[in-house]
Every structure is written in C-alpha cells, then in structure tokens.
C-alpha cells in the first residue's frame, strides 16, 4: 500500500461529496454492454450517457439542469444499428459529440442548443472505415474537426470530420485489440494500451512508434494509458498476481518505470482521469464504489496518494467534467458523474478555503473552447498548444460556453446545408468527388434535351393523326 507521508500539498484535504437525490438523473437504463469504456461524457452544457436500447444502439443527452426522474419516453440519439461502445464531446463545440459502435461505424452528431426535443437518428456525418466494432473515439485537443477512432480490427483511423475523409490509417502498429488511446497536450503524439500488454507512444502523422514498452503490466486484464502535461505516460493495469497497479513512465527512457504502485486485488478496470492544471490523477474502477486520487510531482516517489472518496453503490461508468464547467466560487476542483444501474449521480470535489476570493493557485488558466489549428493545418504538420482562458469570472451553468468562434465550424455549415436540401442529413466518408458529379449532371441534361425533342416530335405526330381522324368523321 501507499506510505502516508505528511507532505505539503494544497490537495491533501480535497473533500468529495455526492449531490442530493433531487440533483441526480434518475430512472436511466445504463448500458449493460461488456466493454470497458466510461459510458458517460460530460461538458459544461450536457451530460451524455450510453443506455440500453432495443434494436440498435443509443445514448441519451441531457442538459445539466435536467435533473430528477427522466421519463421513459425521453428522446435519445439512436442512429447506430449496434450497441454504442464509446462517446466523446468535441472540446471546441459543446453541441458536437462523436460515437463509436458495434456496427463498425463512427457517427458525429450536432445536439440542438437546448437539448433534444425528439429522438435523433440522422447524424451530421457517418465515418465508415473499420471492419469490426469501434471501441474508442477521441477528439484532437487542439485541431478543429480532427477525430480519432480505434476498432477491434486493430486499426486506428484519424478523420477530418469537416470533409468526412479518413486522412491517416495506422494498420500495422497493433497486433491485437486497442484498449485505450490518449492524445498528448498539443496533439502531436498519441499513447496506446494494447491487449498484447504493450504501451506505445506513436507519432500519427509520421506513422512511427516513438517508444514502446512490453509487459508494462503483466496481468491479462485490460490496461489504460494517458499522457500527462509534461510528456510522461501514466498507466493502470494488473500485475501477474492480479493486483491492480498504477505506473508512471518517461517515453525518453521507457525501459524502467519512474514509479509503480500496487493497489488491491479487485478485478475492475481502473479508468484514469487527469487534470493537467493541478497534476492530479483520479482513478475510478468499474465495479468499485470509490474514487482514489493522486498528485504527480517531480519529487520521489513521484506519484503521491492523496485520498479516497467512497460511496455505498458500485459504479458502472464515470463522466468527468472539463475544468471550465466547474463552480470556482465553491472551490470545486473536479466533478464526476457516476453511473449506477438506474441513475447518474454527480460527485463534487472541493478544496475547503476560508476566503471567498478567487483562488488563483487552484485555478491557473485552463484550456478553453477555441481551437488554435484547423484540421488541414494539423494534417500538414503544424502543432498548436491549447488556447488558455481564465476562470476568474466563472461560468453560469446552462449558458452557451462557446466563448469565441474564430471561424464558423464546418459542422454547422454541413448541418445547415443538409436541412435545406431534400437529401439525407448524413454523408458517408465514401462521398462522390465533384468531378463525377459534374459529369453526371451533364449526362442528365443531355437526357432531358433528348426527351424534350421526343415529346415535341410526338406532339406533331399526334396533331397530324387528330387532323386525319377529323377528316374521316366528316
């Protein structure tokens, strides 16, 4: 276990508290599908939850203020033909969400400003390229409209959502199922955890493995890997004796871990959630009833145990609110959305402070919703750090969090065009090039011209026949 050494840390007294029953989301049938994803995604406007659905896959999108009992007839996002396995909100548009499914597709949806009024079955775009179920979807942190997906076909595809095209395909880097993928701070690298017990750091644009570690965790159960803001990689997994482990790795010297800790013998996969502003990692085990949190520092033992928040009920999944959605007036440093079997329960983490003033040390400038790069720039090789915003003035819950729109989102353009036209609202990644469209149009115009000529000649013939008939009658 962890040595409880008394050390100076402003997060030693982080206090966790579940909200009251009337502030939970009740009567929700959380998905029972066997896949180790979080099943929940949250942003400052909505909470999305993967739910049970007959005849396909669905997830529910609720405005944050829509607490209490949720009606069984409440609309869902239900375009997939197989169970939904993973969902992820776009960091640059709080109304755009991506979903991956057992039906081998990735779909991108645009949720109305005030939430769903009727069920949504037509996505903005369908991304087709995987041959097996899609278990991971994750947006690029700094480039607009760049989305990564990973399937049980052991492939990673990076898409330009604005055009519906697959731009990068990593086919030969993983021999088995990919459990998790995480972008680094500026989105230039990804780290992956695979069933072959290896963690890999990959440059996706060069399609090169920068670093890899075999048997990062020797147990057979799934691993997870995330990037920290300093470039190190934090992993969770299982030892050979089936003990749950966490480890810290430096990709520049990945042969030996910077730190390794054994935790317990529970068999639930540990989902890590990371706050780059405070360097705190929260571990939520599927099937656990607790959230453990650790501070990562440059001093040995590098991973410092802070505390554990425990409730009575086990968790089926967990959502983690981005920093810009927190209540800074209450010194809230994290908010989780815990999935039970039939409800979603928000859990608030606060650092008790006597002063009512804004706590600069708890809230350094954080990543905002503006994207420093367009998709095309990133694919051309440019990198950009997150555009930071101050939380000093906080946010009003429920208000639109798109602080500034530098350029109109391509997704919005696609949505408006789709609603104007009579064609279906979704467009597959295998869309016909414009040159072919022009050729087809020319062909159609020629056909119309020949039909007009045919009609004209037939009219003349009919006229002559009518004339002959009238003479015969006389």
UniProtKB/Swiss-Prot annotation:
Cellular compartments annotated: Cell membrane; Cell projection, Lamellipodium; Cell projection, Ruffle membrane; Cytoplasm, Cytoskeleton
Q: Does the keyword Iron-sulfur apply?
A: no
Q: How does it sit in the membrane?
A: Peripheral membrane protein
The annotated phenotype of a deletion mutant is:
Morpholino knockdown of the protein causes subtle defects in mesenchymal cell migration, but no gross anatomical defects. The migration of neural crest cells towards the pharyngeal arches is altered, resulting in no clear separation between the first and second pharyngeal arch cells.
Could you confirm whether the keyword tRNA processing appears in this record? no
- Keyword annotations of the record: Actin-binding, Cell membrane, Cell projection, Coiled coil, Cytoplasm, Cytoskeleton, Endosome, Membrane, Repeat, WD repeat
Sorted alphabetically, the Gene Ontology cellular component annotations on this record are: cell cortex; cytoskeleton; endosome membrane; lamellipodium; ruffle membrane
GO-annotated molecular function: actin filament binding
Coiled-coil positions: 434-468
Region of interest called Disordered, as start-end residue ranges on this chain: 415-437
Question: Where are this protein's WD repeats?
Answer: 79-119, 129-169, 173-212, 216-259, 264-304
Q: Where is the composition biased (Polar residues)?
A: 418-435
- Note the InterPro entries from the entry: Coronin, DUF1899, WD40/YVTN_repeat-like_dom_sf, WD40_repeat_CS, WD40_repeat_dom_sf, WD40_rpt
Q: Could you tell me the Gene Ontology terms of the biological process aspect for this record?
A: actin filament organization; endosomal transport; endosome fission; endosome membrane tubulation; membrane fission; neural crest cell migration
What is the similarity comment for this entry? Answer: Belongs to the WD repeat coronin family.
Role according to the record: Plays a role in directed cell migration by regulating the activation and subcellular location of RAC1. Increases the presence of activated RAC1 at the leading edge of migrating cells. Required for normal organization of the cytoskeleton, including the actin cytoskeleton, microtubules and the vimentin intermediate filaments. Plays a role in endoplasmic reticulum-associated endosome fission: endosome membrane fission of early and late endosomes is essential to separate regions destined for lysosomal degradation from carriers to be recycled to the plasma membrane.
Q: What is this protein called?
A: Coronin-1C-A
Question: Which species?
Answer: Danio rerio
Gene label: coro1ca
């Amino acid at each position: 276990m962890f040595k409880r050494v008394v050390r100076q840390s402003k997060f030693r007294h982080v206090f966790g508290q579940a909200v009251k029953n009337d502030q939970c989301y009740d009567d929700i049938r959380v998905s029972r599908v066997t896949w180790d994803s979080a099943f929940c995604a949250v942003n400052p406007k909505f909470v999305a939850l993967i739910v049970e659905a007959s005849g396909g896959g669905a997830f529910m999108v609720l405005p944050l203020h829509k607490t209490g009992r949720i009606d069984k007839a409440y609309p869902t996002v239900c375009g997939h033909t197989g169970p939904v396995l993973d969902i992820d909100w776009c960091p640059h548009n709080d109304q755009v969400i991506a979903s991956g499914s057992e039906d081998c597709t990735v779909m991108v949806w645009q949720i109305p400003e005030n939430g769903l009024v009727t069920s949504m079955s037509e996505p903005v775009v369908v991304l087709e390229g995987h041959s097996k179920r899609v278990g991971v979807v994750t947006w690029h942190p700094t480039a607009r409209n760049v989305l990564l997906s990973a399937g049980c076909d052991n492939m990673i595809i990076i898409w330009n959502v604005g055009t519906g095209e697959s731009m990068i395909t990593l086919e030969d880097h993983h021999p088995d199922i990919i459990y998790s993928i995480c972008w680094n701070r500026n989105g230039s690298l990804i780290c992956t955890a695979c069933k072959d017990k290896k963690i890999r750091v990959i440059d996706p644009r060069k399609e090169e493995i920068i670093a890899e570690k075999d048997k990062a965790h020797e147990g057979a159960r799934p691993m997870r890997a995330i990037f920290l803001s300093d470039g190190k990689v934090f992993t969770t997994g299982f030892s050979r004796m089936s003990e749950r482990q966490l480890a810290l790795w430096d990709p520049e010297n990945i042969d030996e871990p910077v730190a390794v800790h054994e935790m317990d013998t529970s068999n639930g996969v540990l989902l890590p959630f990371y706050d780059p502003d405070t360097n705190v990692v929260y571990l939520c085990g599927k099937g656990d009833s607790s959230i453990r949190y650790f501070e990562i520092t440059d001093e040995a033992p590098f991973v410092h145990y802070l505390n554990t928040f425990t409730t009575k009920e086990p968790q089926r999944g967990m959502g983690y609110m981005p920093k810009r959605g927190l209540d800074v007036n209450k010194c809230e440093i994290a908010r989780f959305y815990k999935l039970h079997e039939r409800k979603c329960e928000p859990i608030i983490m606060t650092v008790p402070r006597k002063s009512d003033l804004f706590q600069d040390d708890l809230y350094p400038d954080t990543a905002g919703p503006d994207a420093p790069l367009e998709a095309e720039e990133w694919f051309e090789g440019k990198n950009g750090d997150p555009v930071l915003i101050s939380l000093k003035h906080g946010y009003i819950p429920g208000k639109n969090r798109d602080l500034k729109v530098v350029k109109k989102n391509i997704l919005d353009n696609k949505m408006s065009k789709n609603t104007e036209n009579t064609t279906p609202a979704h467009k597959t990644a295998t869309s016909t090039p414009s040159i072919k469209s022009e050729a087809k149009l020319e062909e159609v115009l020629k056909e119309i011209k020949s039909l007009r000529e045919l009609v004209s000649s037939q009219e003349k013939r009919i006229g002559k026949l009518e004339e002959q008939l009238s003479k015969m009658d006389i």
